Amino acid sequence: IHEQQVLLCRRAIEPRHGYWTLPAGFMENGETTEQAALRETYEEAYASPELGPLFSVCNLPRGNQVHLFYLAQMTLAEYGSGPESLEVELYDEHDIPWDDIAFGTVTQTLKRFFEDRKKGVNQLHHIDF
């Protein structure tokens, strides 16, 4: 998050090549979830935000996965495209390419983020897919 915008990456890899996502990826051995979130954000978007609280836990039992999304604050709008991103942009809610979001977990996390922001609340979301 930078001011009122969210940072999205257009994927340069499969699955969902060319679609937009929040910076995300898989953990490496020995990492905490927080370390993985910061590393993936730098690898995909060359951004170094200040990590905030866990925002959403997305259960994907059919894929044997759990997706965790953290809130993270960028103090400066410094970012770029890493090797797994075609482009990286800051978006206002109304400019997000909603039809081109790569994954349902990202769409639902973004929707809940903007809903919470309008209500002035910050809560942890558990989302089942």
List the predicted regions and their residue ranges.
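N-terminal strand-loop-strand
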Residues: 1-21, 49, 53
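Short hydrophobic "strand-cap" motifs at the C-terminus of beta-strands
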Residues: 24
